[in-house]
């Protein structure tokens, strides 16, 4: 059976009912959207068909009418089939959406199966103990000294009482100390984790601020260097352009001067040639010779001036070339320095960007911290979460889920602690009750022994009946049986083992009874826990639907987007179901049937609804019924136990007295003793 329950639990875990419900929610939402779209498309098709009938001639309409009717019939059949499929899907969806997950119940059932298996093991162990008890009884049968056995048993009972008390006290103290230590350790760990997270977050914020400041500083420096570099490069380029223009002008002037010098040289050569011709012609007049001399001297002066100007221009060109090379070298060195600085800044910027990427989750951590602060501390501190990317509705849903999980864990821990405390209390009450019962049993045995010992021994031939009136009735019956006509022995147990067997059997019976009560209490507690969780789940579902209604109201304002979360879709479908006219019609029908009931039926139904709807009323009714049953069982058990104890005590006293008579009056006459008792 445990294997079947375990396999069923594994099957339901693999089945994942919650995931199926979410998928059904999404499918229901898509189905509703498709219904709206199909309605709109159908309306458009009807309008288009009407326009077609209006705009087309009658002959064409008659020809197309059968085709349109066949199309319309097919469309109606398809729509009918889709509606039937959607109705079937919605019925399946309505039945499956509120089905609770049976995995926790199966787990509880599996645990109960394990406990039942343990109970069977305990029963087998009990059988073994009974066998050992029988062996002990056989061994105890060899003991004949009754007084020594009684004293030893009394000493053992006292030792057992002391050990039980000490064990119960030590177990209770150990459990209490262990629970306190566990709570203290958990609280300390929680505080340490909170402090460590806050310190790490502060360090991360500080590092991020320093990195941001360093990044901004490097960016400003890099921007300044780029601007300076651009300005210097533009200035150098302008200066180089000016020098180049000056150099070009100087080159042009040098070329012009060279051309003029060449022309002058040509003129000079022509003048020399003319002088040579003039020297050959000696017959020329003196005026012409003077003119030629003057012309020659003026040309020589102009040639010298041009040569000086050419030399000066060449010097200017050389000086400009030297300054240009020097300027190029300076600009190249400055450009290399600026490039080195730019590379250094770029490397620093890359390092800072890598550090920033390494701490890229700062915003997420900060957002989570603000969300936790807004949910954990005062409402005024949660104003920072309004700037986060998540909307308020998602935060509320997440908070609701976290509170549900925390409530479940606290409830489980509370149930565990209460169960442990109840077990310890039960152990303590069992120990005290067992000690009291053993004391009462010892007192009864001592009283019976004193009663038996106080009886005077009758004479062999006869005695008065005054002392015999004090003998209990069970002893008389045992003696009558002992001295009856059959003369058979009525004692089946040894002499000194009756009280020990009685105490052992009674203690064993009490142990079984308490174990059975513990198992019944655990079963009832598990059922009560399941019912409480189911009711709490229903209340949480109703609260979530109300919360979704508020979210829907908030989303109705302009500028608010509608989320597409699975949880919102599921609660949206439940909210739409609440607005369903069929459900309202069914509610009205139920109200009409309720009004048609008799007053007695109304009172009974109202009382049942009141008890089932209110948690306090359910608890009171449950405990009241449990108290009545326990009271009846306790009274019946007390009556049965008292009768059993009386019978056992009477039988014990009778057997002891019969053994005593059999031992000490064996030589007496049986007939005389029979007459005496008569």
Swiss-Prot record:
Q: Which residues lie on this side of the membrane: Cytoplasmic?
A: 1-619
Q: What's the chief localization of this chain?
A: Golgi
Q: Where in the cell is it found?
A: Golgi apparatus membrane
Q: What is the membrane topology noted in the UniProt record heading this document? A: Single-pass type IV membrane protein
Entry GO CC:
cytoplasm; Golgi membrane; neuron projection; nucleus
Pfam families attached to this UniProt entry: CASP_C, CUX1_N
Q: Which residues lie on this side of the membrane: Lumenal?
A: 641-678
Q: Which InterPro entries match?
A: CASP_C
Q: Which domain of life is it from?
A: Eukaryota
Alphabetized Gene3D superfamilies for the sequence? 1.20.5.1700
Single GO term (MF): DNA binding
- According to the UniProt entry, the coiled-coil residues are 16-40, 67-374, 427-454, 502-556
Q: Which residues carry this modification: Phosphoserine?
A: 586
Sequence intervals crossing the membrane = 620-640
Record bears the keyword Membrane:
yes
What are the protein's UniProt keywords?
A: Coiled coil, Disulfide bond, Golgi apparatus, Membrane, Phosphoprotein, Transmembrane, Transmembrane helix, Transport
- Which tissue types show expression of this protein? Ubiquitously expressed.
Q: Name one GO biological process term.
A: inner ear auditory receptor cell differentiation
Quaternary state and interactors:
Homodimer; disulfide-linked. Interacts with GOLGA5.
Family under the similarity heading? Belongs to the CASP family.
Name of the protein in question: Protein CASP
State the organism named in the record: Mus musculus (Mouse)
């Amino acid at each position: 059976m445990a294997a079947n329950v375990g396999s069923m639990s594994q099957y339901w875990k693999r089945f994942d009912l919650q995931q199926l419900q979410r998928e059904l929610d999404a499918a229901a939402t898509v189905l509703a959207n498709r219904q709206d779209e199909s309605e709109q498309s159908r309306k458009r098709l009807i309008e288009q068909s009407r326009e077609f009938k209006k705009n087309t001639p009658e002959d064409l309409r008659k020809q197309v009418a059968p085709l349109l009717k066949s199309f319309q019939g097919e469309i109606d059949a398809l729509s009918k089939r889709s509606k039937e499929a959607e109705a079937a899907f919605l019925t399946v969806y309505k039945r499956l959406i509120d089905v609770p997950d049976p995995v926790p119940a199966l787990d509880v059932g599996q645990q109960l199966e394990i406990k039942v298996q343990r109970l069977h093991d305990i029963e087998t162990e009990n059988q073994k103990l009974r066998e050992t008890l029988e062996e002990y009884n056989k061994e105890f049968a060899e003991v004949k000294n009754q007084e020594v056995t009684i004293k030893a048993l009394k000493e053992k009972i006292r030792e057992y009482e002391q050990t039980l008390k000490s064990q119960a006290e030590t177990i209770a103290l150990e459990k209490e100390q262990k629970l306190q230590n566990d709570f203290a350790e958990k609280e300390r760990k929680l505080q340490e984790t909170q402090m460590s997270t806050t310190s790490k977050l502060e360090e991360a914020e500080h590092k991020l601020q320093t990195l941001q400041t360093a990044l901004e500083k490097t960016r400003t420096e890099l921007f300044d260097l780029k601007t300076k570099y651009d300005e210097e490069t533009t200035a150098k380029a302008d200066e180089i352009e000016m020098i180049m223009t000056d150099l070009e002008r100087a080159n042009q002037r040098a070329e012009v001067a060279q051309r003029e010098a060449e022309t002058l040289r040509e003129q000079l050569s022509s003048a020399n040639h003319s002088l040579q011709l003039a020297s050959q012609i000696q017959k020329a007049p003196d005026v012409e010779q003077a003119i030629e001399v003057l012309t020659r001297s003026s040309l020589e002066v102009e040639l010298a001036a041009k040569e000086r100007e050419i030399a000066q221009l060449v010097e200017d060109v050389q000086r400009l070339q030297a300054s240009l090379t020097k300027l190029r070298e300076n600009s190249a060195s400055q450009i290399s320095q600026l490039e080195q600085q730019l590379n250094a800044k770029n490397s620093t910027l890359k390092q800072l960007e890598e550090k920033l990427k390494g701490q890229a989750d700062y915003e997420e951590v900060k957002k989570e911290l603000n969300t936790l602060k807004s949910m954990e501390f005062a409402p005024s501190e949660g104003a920072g979460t309004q700037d986060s990317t998540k909307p308020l509705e998602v935060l509320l849903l997440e908070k609701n889920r976290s509170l549900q999980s925390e409530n479940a864990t606290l409830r489980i821990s509370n149930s565990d602690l209460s169960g442990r405390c109840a077990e310890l209390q039960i152990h303590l009450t069992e120990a005290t009750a067992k000690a009291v019962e053993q004391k009462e049993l010892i007192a009864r045995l001592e009283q019976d022994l004193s009663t038996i010992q106080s009886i005077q021994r009758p004479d062999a031939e006869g005695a008065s009946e005054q002392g015999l009136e004090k003998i209990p009735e069970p002893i008389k019956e045992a003696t009558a049986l002992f001295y009856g006509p059959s003369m058979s022995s009525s004692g089946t147990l040894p002499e000194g083992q009756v009280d020990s067997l009685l105490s052992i059997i009674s203690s064993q019976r009490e142990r079984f009874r308490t174990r059975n009560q513990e198992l019944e209490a655990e079963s009832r507690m598990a059922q009560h826990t399941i019912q409480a969780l189911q009711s709490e789940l229903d209340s949480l579902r109703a609260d979530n639907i109300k919360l979704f209604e508020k979210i829907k109201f908030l989303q109705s304002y302009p500028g608010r987007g509608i989320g597409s979360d699975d949880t919102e879709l599921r609660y949206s479908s439940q909210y739409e179901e609440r607005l369903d006219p069929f459900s309202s019609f069914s509610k009205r029908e139920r109200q009409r049937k309720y009004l048609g009931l008799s007053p007695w039926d109304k009172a009974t139904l109202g009382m049942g609804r009141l008890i089932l709807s209110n948690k306090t009323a359910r608890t009171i009714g449950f405990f009241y019924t449990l108290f009545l049953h326990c009271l009846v069982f306790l009274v019946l058990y007390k009556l049965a136990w008292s009768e059993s104890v009386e019978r056992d005590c009477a039988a014990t006293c009778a057997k002891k007295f019969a053994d005593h008579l059999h031992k000490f009056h064996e030589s007496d006459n049986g007939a005389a003793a029979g007459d005496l008792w008569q």
